[in-house]
C-alpha cells in the first residue's frame, strides 16, 4: 500500500479565518472540520473548565438555529456531527452528503457569529449541570476515572497550564457568571483563531464562495491574550508514587512520564517505541506480562502529543487476582529499562513500522480523518503539509532513536506510578523517594 499524496489549498480570509480545502471525488461525501485554538491551557486560575463548557453550549442553539437543532438539522440531512475539547484545542466537525455541504458551513458560521445571542442564564445553568453530571459519571464514579487527571498534576508543575484537567473545577464553573463565559467566547471563538478544513467531494471555488458568504463578515477577535510560558524541565526530576484507594475491581498500575513535544523527532521515536512495547499481542509488554508470566490481564503504552513544553507518555497494567502487584510493576519497569539499554531487533522494528503504516494509511482513506488532521497540523504546528510527511517520519525512526528516547524519557526520575487498589487493600498515600 502506498501513502497517498493529499493535495490541498491553504488560504486566509480578510478576517483571519484559515481555510484549507482538499478535493476528493471518490465518494459523494464531504467533511467540515473547524479547530479553534483554545483549550484548557488557555484558561486562567479561577476560571477553568470554560473551553469544555462551550463544547456543550455550542449545541444549544445560535442566533438563527433553535436549541438542539444543530444536531437535528445535520442528522436530517444524512450527516453526523460532534465536538471535542482537550488541553491544546477545541474542534467541531460534520460529515455530510456532499450536496449538503453548504448546510454544515452555514451552521458552523452561525455558531461562530451568533452563539452569544442564544446564550442565556437558563442555558448556562443547564449546561453547567450537564458538565457536573459528566464529571461524576466519567471521572468521579468511574473505576480508575481519575488516573489521567492525577498524572497531569504530577507530570506538570502547579503553575503550568496543563496541570489542571480539561473538564475544569466545578467550583470555578459554579462561580462563573454569564458575563464571564461570554467574554471567554468573544476572545477565542473568532475567525482569526480558527482553522476550517473542508475535504471530500467538493468544488473548491464553490467552497470559497460559501465560506466567504457565511464567515467573511464575522469580526475578528482583538483580545486574544498571549499564552504564559510553557517552559518546563525535560524531566520531572524525581519518581512520584501514589496508592489510590478506589471502588475498582482489580489492582491496576498506571505509569506516566514527561516527554518531548509533538513535532519533535524524538516524539516520533517515542510513538514507534510505544508500538514495540504495547502494540498488539506480539509486543514486549503483552508477550511477557500477559502471555508468558500471566501476571497481568491487560497492558498498554502510548504517547500523547502536546505542544506546550512537554507531552505525556503513559502506560498501564491490570494485575491478575492473587498476584503481588509489586511483581507486575517490576516486570513492566524492567521492559522499559531494557528498551533503553539494548537496541530493538530488526524484526521488532519492522513489525512496529508495519502497524503504524497500516493504521496511518487506513485513517487517511477517510475524508473526516483527513479534515481533522489538516486542521490539527495547521493549528498546533502551523504546518498542514505534515499530513503528507508524518508517516515518512515514523518510518525513518531507527533502533538508535528508539533506544535514545527510551533512555531520555523512560527513566525512574521522570516517572509517576499510580497504583489503584480495591478499597479494602489500600494502605498508603503518596510516596516520594528520598533524593
Task: Describe these PLM feature segments.
Residues 208-224, 340:
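Glycine-centered hinge/linker elements that transmit conformational signals in sensory
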Residues 87-93, 120-133:
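Short, glycine/charge-rich beta-strand/loop segments that flank catalytic centers
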Residues 39-47:
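Short pre-active-site segment immediately N-terminal to the catalytic Zn-binding motif
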Residues 60-64, 113-122:
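Short, polar/flexible loop-turn hinges at active-site or ligand-entry regions and domain interfaces
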Residues 106-111, 209-215, 328-334:
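Short amphipathic alpha-helices in soluble, non-transmembrane regions
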Residues 49-62:
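Active-site SXXK
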Residues 1-40, 64-100, 138-193, 217-264, ...:
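Non-catalytic beta-strand/loop surface segments
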Amino acid at each position: 500500500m502506498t501513502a497517498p499524496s493529499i493535495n490541498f489549498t491553504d488560504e486566509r480570509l480578510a478576517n483571519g479565518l484559515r481555510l484549507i480545502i482538499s478535493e476528493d471525488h471518490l465518494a459523494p461525501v464531504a467533511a467540515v472540520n473547524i479547530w479553534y485554538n483554545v483549550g484548557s491551557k488557555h484558561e486562567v486560575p479561577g476560571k477553568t473548565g470554560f473551553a469544555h463548557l462551550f463544547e456543550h453550549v455550542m449545541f444549544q442553539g445560535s442566533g438563527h438555529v433553535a436549541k438542539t437543532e444543530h444536531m437535528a438539522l445535520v442528522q436530517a440531512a444524512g450527516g453526523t456531527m460532534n465536538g471535542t475539547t482537550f488541553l491544546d484545542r477545541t474542534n467541531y466537525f460534520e460529515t455530510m452528503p456532499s450536496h449538503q455541504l453548504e448546510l454544515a458551513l452555514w451552521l458552523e458560521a452561525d455558531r461562530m457569529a451568533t452563539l452569544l445571542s442564544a446564550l442565556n442564564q437558563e442555558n448556562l445553568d443547564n449546561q453547567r449541570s450537564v458538565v457536573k453530571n459528566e464529571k461524576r459519571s466519567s471521572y468521579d464514579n468511574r473505576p480508575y476515572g481519575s488516573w489521567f487527571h492525577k498524572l497531569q498534576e504530577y507530570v506538570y508543575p502547579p503553575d503550568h497550564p496543563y496541570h489542571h484537567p480539561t473538564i475544569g473545577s466545578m467550583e470555578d464553573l459554579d462561580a462563573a457568571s454569564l458575563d464571564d463565559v461570554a467574554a471567554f467566547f468573544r476572545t477565542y471563538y473568532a475567525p482569526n483563531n480558527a482553522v476550517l478544513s473542508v475535504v471530500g467531494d467538493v468544488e473548491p471555488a464553490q467552497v470559497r464562495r460559501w465560506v466567504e458568504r457565511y464567515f467573511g463578515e464575522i469580526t475578528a477577535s482583538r483580545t486574544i491574550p498571549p499564552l504564559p510560558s510553557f517552559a518546563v524541565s525535560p524531566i520531572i526530576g524525581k519518581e512520584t508514587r501514589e496508592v489510590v484507594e478506589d471502588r475498582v475491581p482489580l489492582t491496576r498500575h498506571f505509569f506516566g512520564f514527561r516527554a518531548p513535544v509533538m513535532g519533535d523527532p524524538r516524539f516520533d521515536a517515542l510513538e514507534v517505541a510505544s508500538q514495540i512495547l504495547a502494540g498488539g499481542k506480539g509486543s514486549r509488554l503483552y508477550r511477557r506480562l500477559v502471555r508468558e508470566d500471566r501476571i497481568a490481564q491487560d497492558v498498554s503504552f502510548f504517547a500523547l502529543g502536546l505542544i506546550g513544553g512537554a507531552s505525556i507518555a503513559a502506560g498501564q497494567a491490570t494485575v491478575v487476582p492473587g498476584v503481588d502487584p509489586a511483581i507486575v510493576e517490576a516486570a513492566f519497569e524492567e521492559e522499559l529499562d531494557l528498551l533503553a539499554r539494548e537496541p530493538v531487533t530488526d524484526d521488532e522494528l519492522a513489525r512496529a513500522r508495519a502497524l503504524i503504516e497500516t493504521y496511518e494509511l487506513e485513517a487517511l482513506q477517510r475524508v473526516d480523518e483527513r479534515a481533522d488532521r489538516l486542521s490539527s497540523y495547521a493549528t498546533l504546528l502551523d504546518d498542514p503539509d505534515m499530513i503528507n510527511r508524518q508517516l515518512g517520519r515514523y518510518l525513518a525512526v531507527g533502533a538508535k532513536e528508539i533506544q535514545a528516547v527510551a533512555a531520555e524519557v523512560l527513566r525512574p526520575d521522570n516517572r509517576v506510578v499510580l497504583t489503584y487498589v480495591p478499597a479494602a487493600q489500600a494502605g498508603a498515600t503518596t510516596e516520594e523517594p528520598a533524593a
